[in-house]
C-alpha cells in the first residue's frame, strides 16, 4: 500500500485505534502485543515525520519500513471476552494481596481487599464464585488469625497506617467469609483437590481474529464486529430482575455502599422503591423501610443544600408512618437498638407464634432526625413568606409520628424494661414536650385534637390520657414523667420547659418558685449550649410574666441579666452578631447558626427591650430624684443601659418627636422626671408595641397607674426639703390617686427609710423632719472629699503600676546599723520617706489622706 494515504499526521492511526475498541465494550486493558505494535507504529510515524523533508520522488518509494508494516498486519490479534477480562483483573488484585502479605503491608491489603470484593460482584453476574477468590479469602483469614497470635506474644507494635488497615481487615474478613462459608469449608477440607477440580463453567477459548489493515479497520467496523463468532456485545445498564428472594441481597449491597464515594443514592432509593413493590413478608417490608429511610437521610447529608428537600422529607415522613403501621400490626417483629443483624441473605427468619424477632434499628432516631431536618429547613426559609407557613404546617404530621413513636416505644418498655429502652422513651417524650411548651393553650388544644383523630383507635398510652386536650394537664404529665424516669440534662430541660409554660400563661409565682427550688441558676454553666439557651428563654419569659402582673421590680431584676448585656439575640439564639474583629472560627460560626431557633419560636426583641426600659424607668427616675436631693446617699445605678440612653438624649441640642419604641420610653422618662405624669402616661401608652401583648388595654391601665405612683414618689423626693408638712388631699388631687393609696405609698417610703417624715393621721398630712438632710454647703464638702479620695486612690494605683517590682524599695524595714538607701549608715532614714509618728512607716497604696484641713473640719 502506498504511504501517500497516511499523510504527515496520525489522524488515521488514532481513528484506527478507536475502532479497535469495538471488539469488546468492556475492554479495560490492551494486550501486550497490541501495545508493542502501537509503540512500533508510533516510532514509524516519528520516522516518517523526520523524512518529511526528502525529495518528492523518494516519498512514494517503498522502504524497508513498509515491508515490516505489511508483515505486522499479518499478525493475529487475540480477542478476550468480558468475563475473562474480569477474571484477569481479579487475579492481578489477588497477586497484589499476596505480595502485601509477604511484607505485612496491611494498608495495601485493606484497600485491595475492598477492590477485590467490588470485582467479585461483577464476576458473580456471569458465573459462580471463582475458586481463586475462595482460596484468597480463606488464606487471608488464616493470616489474620496468625498475625493476631503474633501480636499477643510479641511486644512489637505496628505503625499507625498498618494498624488501621489491620483492624479494618480483621472486622471485614469475618463478616465477608460468612457469605462463602460452605465454599471455604470445602477448600480447607482438601485444598489441592478443590483447586484442581474442573470449574463449573468452562472458560471459552479466545478466538484469534486476523489483524486488519488500518484502512480496512476504518472502512468496515461493522463487518469486524459481526465476525466474532461465539461472542456478543455486552451492553451496560442491563435491567435487573427484582424478586422477593433477592431483596435481602440487594439491601446488603446498598448498606455496604453507605459512606463510600461516587455512590448514586438516588438510584439506590429507586431500587428500594421497586423492592417495596415486590416485598411479600412483613420482615422484608420492615427491612426495606429501615434502609430506605436511612438512605434518604444520607442523601441530605452528602448534598450541598443546607437542609433536606421538602420532597425527600415528606417521603421519609410517610415511609416512617407506614413502617409504624406495619410494626403496630405485626407485633412479633420488633425494631430495637442493639439487636443482632440477620446474616443469611438466602433465607428469611422463621418466627413461630408467640415468639419475637428483633430487627436492628432505631425508630426514635428516625423521628428525631425528621424533627431536626424540619427545624433546619425552618431556619433557612424566609419567615415572612408563604413558604414558611406552608413548611410549618408539616409539624402536625411530625407531631403525630412523635406520639405514635412514643406509644410504640412505651409498649416495648412495658414488655421488657431496659435502660436503653427507657432512655429512648425519655428522648421521644422530651421531643414531644419541646414541640408544645412554648405554644399558647389554644394552639396546643387544636394540635392534640388533630393528633388524637389521626392516631389509630386501638393505640393506648399510660403516660398521657387520650382525648384529654387540656394543655396544662398535658405539659404537667409529660414533665412529671421525665422527673421520675430521667436525670441530668433531660430532667433539667423538662423543668425549664414547665417553668416557661407557666410563665407564658401568667402563673408568675409558681414559675418563680420552681426556678428557685430547682437551683438551675447555680448549675446552668455546666450544661450544654442548647440547655443554656432554654434557660435564658425561660428567664426572659419569667420577666415578661412579672411585668404583665405589674411586678416592676421583679421584672427589671429578672430581665437585667439578659437585656443589660446588649447581646439578647445571641443569648436567646435568635440571631448572630458578627463583630468586626471577631475571633470566632468558621466552625464555631457554623455551630452557632445550627443552634438558632426557628422564627415562630422567637421572643419579640423590640417588645422585650421596651419592657426592660419601661421597668428601668419606673425604678431609675425616683432614684435619680432621691440622690439629687440627698447627696449624702451613695450613688447607685440600677440600669446602665437606661442611664446611658437618657444621658445621650439629654445631650442632644434638638430633640424631635419619638420615632421608635426606645425614644418613646426615654421621652416618657423625661416627662416623669419633670413631674408631668400625665404627659408621661400619654407618651408611654402611645407606643404601639403594647398591642402585641395579650389584653393590651389592661397593660396600658397598669402602666398609667404605675406612672401615677412613681410620679408621686419622684415629687416627694424632689420637694421634701422645701416642705414642713404636706396635705394628703393635695397630693390626691395632683396625682389623681385615692388618699388611702397615697397613705400606703408614703408609709412604705417611711418604713424603707427613703423619706424622713411622719404621717399625721389626725390632720391627714405628712410632717417632714428637718435636720436630717445636709445643708447645701455640707453636701458640697462631702462631694469634694469623695472626689479627693478617689483622686488619691487613682494616683497611688498608677504609681504601683509604674513601679511594679520596685515596690520593695519603698517599704524596707530599717534595723539598727542597716543601710538606708543612699543615706548614712546606721539609723538614717529609709529611702521610702519619713516615718509617721510612732515609728510606723508610710505604706504606698493605702488610703492615708485624711482630707487635710477640710477633712479635719468635717471630722470635728
Swiss-Prot record:
<dbReference type="GO" id="GO:0043614">
    <property type="term" value="C:multi-eIF complex"/>
</dbReference>
<comment type="similarity">
    <text>Belongs to the eIF-3 subunit C family.</text>
</comment>
<feature type="compositionally biased region" description="Acidic residues">
    <location>
        <begin position="10"/>
        <end position="51"/>
    </location>
</feature>
<dbReference type="InterPro" id="IPR036390">
    <property type="entry name" value="WH_DNA-bd_sf"/>
</dbReference>
<keyword id="KW-0963">Cytoplasm</keyword>
<keyword id="KW-0396">Initiation factor</keyword>
<dbReference type="InterPro" id="IPR000717">
    <property type="entry name" value="PCI_dom"/>
</dbReference>
<dbReference type="InterPro" id="IPR008905">
    <property type="entry name" value="EIF3C_N_dom"/>
</dbReference>
<dbReference type="GO" id="GO:0001732">
    <property type="term" value="P:formation of cytoplasmic translation initiation complex"/>
</dbReference>
<dbReference type="GO" id="GO:0003723">
    <property type="term" value="F:RNA binding"/>
</dbReference>
<dbReference type="InterPro" id="IPR027516">
    <property type="entry name" value="EIF3C"/>
</dbReference>
<keyword id="KW-0648">Protein biosynthesis</keyword>
<feature type="compositionally biased region" description="Low complexity">
    <location>
        <begin position="832"/>
        <end position="846"/>
    </location>
</feature>
<dbReference type="InterPro" id="IPR036388">
    <property type="entry name" value="WH-like_DNA-bd_sf"/>
</dbReference>
<feature type="region of interest" description="Disordered">
    <location>
        <begin position="812"/>
        <end position="860"/>
    </location>
</feature>
<dbReference type="GO" id="GO:0010494">
    <property type="term" value="C:cytoplasmic stress granule"/>
</dbReference>
<dbReference type="GO" id="GO:0005852">
    <property type="term" value="C:eukaryotic translation initiation factor 3 complex"/>
</dbReference>
<feature type="region of interest" description="Disordered">
    <location>
        <begin position="1"/>
        <end position="76"/>
    </location>
</feature>
<dbReference type="GO" id="GO:0006413">
    <property type="term" value="P:translational initiation"/>
</dbReference>
<dbReference type="Pfam" id="PF01399">
    <property type="entry name" value="PCI"/>
</dbReference>
<dbReference type="Pfam" id="PF05470">
    <property type="entry name" value="eIF-3c_N"/>
</dbReference>
<dbReference type="GO" id="GO:0003743">
    <property type="term" value="F:translation initiation factor activity"/>
</dbReference>
<protein>
    <recommendedName>
        <fullName>Eukaryotic translation initiation factor 3 subunit C</fullName>
    </recommendedName>
</protein>
<dbReference type="GO" id="GO:0016282">
    <property type="term" value="C:eukaryotic 43S preinitiation complex"/>
</dbReference>
<dbReference type="GO" id="GO:0071540">
    <property type="term" value="C:eukaryotic translation initiation factor 3 complex, eIF3e"/>
</dbReference>
<dbReference type="GO" id="GO:0071541">
    <property type="term" value="C:eukaryotic translation initiation factor 3 complex, eIF3m"/>
</dbReference>
<feature type="compositionally biased region" description="Gly residues">
    <location>
        <begin position="817"/>
        <end position="831"/>
    </location>
</feature>
<comment type="function">
    <text>Component of the eukaryotic translation initiation factor 3 (eIF-3) complex, which is involved in protein synthesis of a specialized repertoire of mRNAs and, together with other initiation factors, stimulates binding of mRNA and methionyl-tRNAi to the 40S ribosome. The eIF-3 complex specifically targets and initiates translation of a subset of mRNAs involved in cell proliferation.</text>
</comment>
<feature type="domain" description="PCI">
    <location>
        <begin position="599"/>
        <end position="773"/>
    </location>
</feature>
<comment type="subunit">
    <text>Component of the eukaryotic translation initiation factor 3 (eIF-3) complex.</text>
</comment>
<dbReference type="GO" id="GO:0031369">
    <property type="term" value="F:translation initiation factor binding"/>
</dbReference>
<feature type="compositionally biased region" description="Gly residues">
    <location>
        <begin position="847"/>
        <end position="860"/>
    </location>
</feature>
<dbReference type="GO" id="GO:0033290">
    <property type="term" value="C:eukaryotic 48S preinitiation complex"/>
</dbReference>
